[in-house]
Amino acid sequence: MQDFVSISLVYLGIYALSVWSLNLQFGYAGIINFGWIVFQSIGAYFAAVTSIGPVTSHSYQTYIFGSRLAFPLPLIVGTASGAVLAAILGYVVLSRKIRSDFVAVIMLVVAIIALQVVTANVSLFNGANGLSGIPQPFNGILHLSQSGYQWFYVGWLTVICVIVYLGVEWLCKSSWGRSLRAMREDEVLATHLGINVQVLRLVVFIIGGAIAAFSGALLVEFLGAWSPDAWSFVETFVVFVAVYIGGRGNNRGAFLGALLVPVIFGVFPSFLPAFGYPGLSSTLQWVVIALLWLCTFYFRPAGIMPEGRLIVQREGQPDVSSMFRRGWAARRAQRSEAR
């Protein structure tokens, strides 16, 4: 039971980072990134190959860039790889005046091609067999039991999630975040307001890709293995549904979506005993997630926690909202006296 709870909490932390990265791109900037899973996967792969060590004649795995870097360098390399890939793809795709629906299709094609290339080419990351034997950070120093190490990872991941959440919230509530909202609502108007839309889209795409790669690096360091089966392009759909159900443009809502969709309907059923024919439980997971998304789409399109209204006041200007509230209270008082 303890392993069940600790593993579920680890996945909750990973999915929290995942939804925050996608919420930056999709919720705040309006970029439909159907290739999001590629960034998480490249972070996992590069964190893995920089932790395992170089390939030798006795190795049972083949991969590129094999080295054994000291922790936390593998996490840094994995995060940087996601940022570099996002910069390349963002420059190619987002710098052109391509409609958002075409961008979504292009990124989906990129995810499918990347999966096929990594699976078919054994020399990259050991092909369809994937990578295994990835050392877990701190495990050789702390000498904890398996259960103890899992709970240690839960605590460490909680600290990371709090830091990332505070950083993302600070970005989204700053003037930079307001520019993202303006770009999402009307790019033409944002351009006339002096916002460089192309640069802004590229920057938020890089930040989101880096956070996604960081989540993949953290996950592979915990699992100790990674294979192409772990990053099918349909995994992007789960994160999208979590952001949409929780509330796009709201980081707390995105976290709630991560708790509901990937963890409750994704992680929990994997620990339940098998019933029916083989594969029935996994099939029902997708059915429930799809039905949950449809219900949200029809009955609460803004999500469980919708994006709040943003009232901005410049320094030296009167507080219009407080003036309105005082005027409204005065009118109510006059009406009550008249009665």
What kind of region is each of these model predictions?
Residues 1-339:
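Transmembrane alpha-helices and adjacent helix-loop boundaries
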